[in-house]
């Protein structure tokens, strides 16, 4: 069977695209072309609605706290209430002047580092008052979801999204244009769970483009829950209905609220936002998120959405259920904590703590789409736990080469950290100070971001542990005939007698150090690994090319060694129902198979297909369901997300 598959896997039809199938620019150009020719208001673009999906796994994210990044327009810093601004930058609870012009000014710095998407803290208009001495510089105390925070745009600029819908002449619109000109994406942080705390006798005053529509203290329309603070964090009802730190908590059962929040976020998407990061998702029921994400995908099918389930973990059934059934992926807190414990804190288990997380990937439908990180704005920075730049390099290499979508917290590349009070909030949000493009971590991120875009094994492939001790960790990423071998050392210099790489025999050059390594019989012998050293060896195989590429992901199928999942159907690309010519998928983990299927002859046509399990020496096991049907897009990239329908022995 493998012999039958081999020609089909490598002799794909000629490409209509550029040679570099994996460049972010290709996907961006496709999206731009669609945006430039939208359907009329009365026309529904059914092809776009049912055949497009965003591919975000090749991105390198960079998370920015807007107020603490760069002040590109000092004239707007005082804002409506000068009391909320500290020009000395000594009061950590007040605004320090960062704005959207500052981000525009530094886009070339970010682009050069290999950043392909920036995640910004919320840009909505905030309350202009102090709560326990703190201003809403973080963006999570919203007053009006349909207006831009005036502190982030130029003085006198219209903050209303409605009033600038036609002109699109705000600093925010210029940021979108500058990003897209550089083939970069914008991730907008949004908050659906709450509005604002009690300040000066007011709480939860909410506006719809300047018109007051809700008030926690005068809530006849029941826009808010009124159950007080969460007392028991193990009680799901309390977590979803009670207050978090005194914040007015929305009542998701109120259809007026749901219509308002969805219409607001759609306006931001219409202005060019590419992806959404959703705050505090564990504090609202999953049915709300299913409705919300469904509406967002119907409005903008190529939007990518991920949520913050604080301290999610693969052993936490509720967070796993959310990741699998909410319509969005999540931030991978489980891996983050394991990396911090193993590398920053040096816990005895070391890399075994990290492998324990990867061993649970089968619990997720989309483990390769989890957002990975080593720190953020809600915890001490990695370097506040361990200031050794060499161990930071190991941690960055890990998240940039292992499964998931890596996210770098602003300033990490410049070793930015303030260790006051252990680096806890608010000291984990210092002002960005340096812009050194020769910083070692800056250069590391640039190299590894390029690797992620060039080598599909790193962004989409399976991950296989090849060597592990508490101090040394080796793994292989594999997709089709592309490979990446990674070896990390958190400890002293060590010589490894032999380690399997799966690379072809011959000399290979480390992406990071340019050191040479000889592979024989797929292994490296007597490998010397320096103290806190890293080795990254890459081999890029033949790329999948076609007029339309379908990225098919199948979950829920249990296979044994030697069994292969294939896609069969009524078109030549899928073998015309001949199981011997069906298209083979790639094993990702025990819950996920994946394939990129090129379509040329059938592009733009309706096809039928189903999945089958090829078993050596036994009859194939086909799904027990009516054939799936799909209209293949005429060109570009499509994603199928399917769940195996248990087969029936014939």
Give the location of each predicted region:
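Substrate-binding/active-site clefts of carbohydrate-active enzymes
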Residues: 47, 54-59, 67-271, 291-309, ...
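Carbohydrate-interacting/catalytic domains
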Residues: 1-65, 71, 78-81, 96, ...
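Aromatic-rich carbohydrate-binding modules that target alpha-glucans
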Residues: 557-606, 614-634
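Active-site-proximal helices and loops of the catalytic beta/alpha 8
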Residues: 16-20, 43-45, 176, 180-184, ...
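Short, flexible loop/turn elements at secondary-structure junctions
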Residues: 65-68, 124, 149-152, 192-194, ...
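Structural recognition of the beta-strand scaffold that forms the well-ordered cores
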Residues: 61-65, 117-122, 141-147, 186-189, ...
């Amino acid at each position: 069977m493998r012999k039958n598959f081999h020609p089909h896997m490598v002799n794909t039809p000629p490409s209509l695209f550029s040679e570099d199938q994996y460049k972010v620019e290709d996907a961006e150009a496709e999206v731009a072309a669609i945006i430039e020719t939208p359907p009329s208001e009365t026309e529904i673009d059914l092809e776009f609605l049912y055949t497009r999906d965003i591919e975000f796994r090749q991105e390198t994210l960079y998370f920015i706290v807007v107020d603490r990044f760069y002040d590109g327009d000092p004239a707007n810093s005082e804002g409506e209430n000068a009391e909320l601004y500290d020009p000395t930058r000594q009061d950590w609870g007040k605004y320090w002047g960062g704005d959207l012009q500052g981000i525009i000014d530094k886009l070339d710095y970010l682009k050069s580092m290999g950043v392909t998407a920036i995640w910004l803290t919320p840009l909505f208009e905030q309350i202009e008052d102090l709560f326990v001495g703190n201003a809403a510089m973080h963006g999570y105390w919203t007053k009006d979801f349909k207006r831009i925070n005036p502190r982030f745009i130029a003085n006198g600029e219209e903050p209303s999204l409605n009033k600038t819908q036609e002109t699109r002449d705000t600093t925010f619109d210029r940021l979108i244009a500058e990003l897209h000109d550089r083939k970069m994406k914008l991730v907008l942080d949004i908050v659906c769970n709450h509005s604002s705390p009690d300040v000066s006798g007011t709480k939860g005053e909410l506006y719809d483009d300047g018109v007051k529509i809700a008030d926690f203290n005068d809530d006849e329309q029941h826009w808010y829950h009124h159950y007080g603070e969460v007392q028991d964090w193990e009680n799901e009802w309390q977590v979803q209905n009670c207050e978090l730190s005194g914040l007015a908590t929305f009542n998701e059962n109120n259809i007026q609220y749901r219509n308002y929040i969805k219409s607001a976020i759609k306006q931001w998407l219409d202005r060019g936002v590419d992806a959404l990061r959703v705050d505090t998702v564990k504090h609202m029921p999953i049915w709300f998120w299913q409705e919300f994400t469904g509406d967002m995908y119907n409005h903008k099918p190529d939007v990518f959405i991920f949520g913050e389930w604080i301290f999610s973990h693969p052993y936490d059934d509720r967070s796993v259920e959310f990741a699998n059934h909410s319509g969005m992926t999540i931030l991978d807190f489980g891996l983050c904590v394991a990396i911090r414990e193993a590398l920053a804190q040096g816990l005895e288990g070391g890399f075994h703590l990290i492998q324990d997380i990867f061993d649970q990937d089968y619990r997720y439908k989309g483990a390769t789409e989890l957002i990975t990180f080593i720190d953020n704005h809600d915890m001490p920075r990695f370097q506040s736990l361990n200031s050794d730049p060499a161990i930071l390099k190991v941690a960055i290499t890990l998240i940039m080469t292992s499964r998931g979508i890596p996210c770098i917290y602003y300033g990490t590349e410049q070793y930015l950290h303030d260790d006051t009070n252990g680096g806890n909030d608010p000291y984990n949000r210092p002002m960005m100070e340096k812009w050194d493009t020769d910083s070692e971590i800056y250069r590391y991120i640039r190299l590894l971001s390029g690797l992620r875009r060039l080598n599909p094994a790193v962004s989409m492939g399976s991950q296989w542990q090849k060597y592990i001790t508490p101090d040394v960790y080796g793994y292989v990423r594999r997709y089709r005939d592309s490979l990446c071998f990674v070896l990390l050392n958190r400890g002293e210099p060590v010589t490894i007698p032999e380690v399997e790489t799966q690379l072809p025999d011959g000399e290979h050059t480390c992406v990071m150090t340019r050191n040479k390594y000889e592979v024989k019989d797929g292994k490296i012998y007597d490998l010397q690994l320096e103290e806190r050293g890293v080795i990254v060896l890459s081999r890029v195989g033949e790329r999948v090319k076609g007029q339309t590429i379908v990225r098919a992901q199948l979950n829920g199928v249990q296979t044994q060694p030697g069994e292969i999942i294939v896609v069969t159907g009524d078109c030549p690309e899928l073998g015309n129902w001949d199981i011997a010519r069906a298209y083979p998928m790639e094993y990702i983990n025990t819950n996920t198979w994946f394939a990129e299927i090129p379509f040329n002859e059938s592009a733009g046509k309706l096809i039928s297909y189903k999945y089958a399990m090829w078993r050596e020496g036994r009859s194939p096991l086909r799904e027990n369901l009516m054939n799936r049907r799909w209209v293949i897009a005429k060109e570009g990239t499509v994603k199928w997300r399917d769940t195996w329908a248990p087969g029936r022995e014939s």
